[in-house]
Structure formats: C-alpha cells, structure tokens
Amino acid sequence: MAFKIASSPHVTRNLHTSTVMQRVILCLLPGLVVQCAFFGWGTLVQVLLAILVALSCEAAVMKLRNRNIKASLSDNSAMLTAILIGVAIPPLAPWWMIVMGTAFAIVIVKHLYGGLGHNLFNPAMAAYVLLLVSFPVQMTTWIAPSTVALHSPSLVESLQLIFNIGAHVNMEQFRLGIDGMTMATPLDTLKTDLSMGLTTTESLTKAIFDGSTGVGWFWVNLAYLAGGLVLLKLKAIRWHISTGVLLGLFVASSIGFLLSPDTQASPLMHLFSGATMLAAFFIATDPVTAATSPRGRIIFGALIGVLVYIIRTKGGYPDAFAFAVLLANLCAPFIDYYVRPRTYGHSTS
C-alpha cells in the first residue's frame, strides 16, 4: 500500500474561480439595490447592458484564440468586471459609453495581456479612466438622489435617456431637482465650493449634503461596506487590502482635517462618499493586480488610501479611486519585490 506524504494542512478547501466570483457578485447586490433606490433604474440598465457586452466580447475573444468559450464564460470574471463598470458610471450615461468602456476592459485590458490572471491593471478601473478622460462631462453628470429630487426618472424615462429615444425626455428635467443643485456629486460640489473660497461648513449647508456626508451616498457606501464584511466572512477576500485602504484614507484625511478644518472634508466624508467602500472591498482587492504578501497587501491598500486623499484634495477628479488603484497596480510588482516574506531557515537578504 502506498501512502502519499505531504505537509499539513491535510484537509483543505479549494475555491474555484467561479465560486469566488459568484460570492463577490452576490455581495455586490446590496450596494447595487441601494444605489438603484437613490439614483433610479439607470444603474440597473447600465449593469445589464455592461454584462451583455462583456459576455459577448469574452466569447468573441475566446473564439479568436481557439479557447473554451463555455469555460471562460462560466468563471464569472467578465460578469464581475461588467457589474463594477456599470455601478461606477453615472446612471443616465449614453449607452455607447458603457459599450465602449466594457469592450475596452475585456478585449484590451484583460485579454491583450493574456487573459484572466495575467492583466497588469484592474480592467474595470482602466475602463473608467478611459471614459472619464475621454468624456469628462458625461462621466460627471449624476442626477440628484431620489430623496431630494422633485422628479426621479422612471424605468421608461431612463431607457429613453440612455438610448436617446423620445424627444419629450431630456436631462434638463433632472438637472435642478432643488434650488441650486447641479448634477455634480457631493465630492465635486465640495471641491468646487472650496475653490470659490467657501468654507467646508458653508458648503455642507447645501441640500445635496446630509450633515457631514452626501445625501444618499452614505447609505450606498454603508451597503457596500455590509457586502464587503460578508465577503470577508466568506473568505473570498483577505482583510489586508481593505483595511489598508480605509486606514490610509482615514489617517491622511484626519491629518488634513485637523490642520485645516475650514478647507478640508472630514474623515467621515471621505470614508462614506463616492466609491470608497466599493473600491476598498470589491476593486482594490483584485488578487491579480494587487500585491501578494500580507505586509505587501497592507502597504498596497494604504498606498491607495493616501493617493485617494491626495488626488481628491489636490487633483482635478474628486472621486479618485480609479487613478489611485491604477497607480497602485503599477507599484504592486515593486512592493512584492521589496516586501518578501521571510522563508523559514533563511535570512531576509
């Protein structure tokens, strides 16, 4: 009788890629539902359109590469990328933008570098940056949350606006839900007000803010935080990167707020505005484009958090996670090289 000799642990549980992706997608659903509740049906339409484009592009590329189409589609990676792009862009953005961004993410960013497990950059964030740089007006046009808007677009109106059909529906109907409210996000509004000489306290009196956070965005971030905690409980991701992102952003924003409270947003505003929780738990934790060692993951996450604060306060794009994640992706190989775990019985050198 032959015995297989192997080191512990002897009982392991291997999660397939498709299982991990399914868990991530399921944990995204609470945030998606809350986002749709505040910003209308457009978000759901964008997500469904992105999924259709992503699966089509994935199948086409696999066909050209003579690979197994069914296996590639069933790993759910393309679907996850599509959902992340769909929730990141404004809900009423034109249909061709989500098509362009999703196709770019799947064909160029993912498969041009070799496919799943070989891409250097996060596909969803690379697509977001492409759209933001190419079409800044459309990518910064968010409607007012339903709780403060006089009229929120219905499903039919959302479809008409996204696909540009129906002459009686236009974006102007949702531009000013309440007096003085533009179609900018709370982070955009705060940055614009500060550049005009207003203090943080004066800016926060506007109706788009609810105390120290943006209307609707606090609950959206809270929903993504809840989904992220479930994701940690399911062990689909590790805690290092998410903790690093939130700690890096919290420490940097706390220092800035303590030094200049009149010209800086509070740490609570930074943590629960924009895509903070979505990025911390669902984007930055992409194992392909992140650092690999435990210490390296913490450094990687902290780098993202600090970069987000710097870009939000000094740069031109208040919700800076896409740029921060891509810059950290570039640094991941260097972090892995210089922060290598010590092998037992060997020196660190």
Swiss-Prot record:
It is found in: Cell inner membrane. Its EC number is 7.-.-.-. Keywords: Cell inner membrane, Cell membrane, Electron transport, Flavoprotein, FMN, Membrane, Phosphoprotein, Translocase, Transmembrane, Transmembrane helix, Transport. Pfam families: NQR2_RnfD_RnfE. Its cofactor is FMN. The modification FMN phosphoryl threonine is found at T185. Its main location: membrane. The chain crosses the membrane at residues 20-42, 77-99, 124-144, 212-232, 239-259, 265-285, 291-311, 315-335. It is a multi-pass membrane protein. InterPro entries: NqrB/RnfD (IPR004338), RnfD_bac (IPR011303). GO terms for biological process: electron transport chain; transmembrane transport. It is an enzyme of class 7 (translocase). GO terms for cellular component: plasma membrane. It comes from the Bacteria. The complex is composed of six subunits: RnfA, RnfB, RnfC, RnfD, RnfE and RnfG. Part of a membrane-bound complex that couples electron transfer with translocation of ions across the membrane. Belongs to the NqrB/RnfD family. This is Ion-translocating oxidoreductase complex subunit D. The lineage of its organism: Bacteria, Pseudomonadati, Pseudomonadota, Gammaproteobacteria, Alteromonadales.
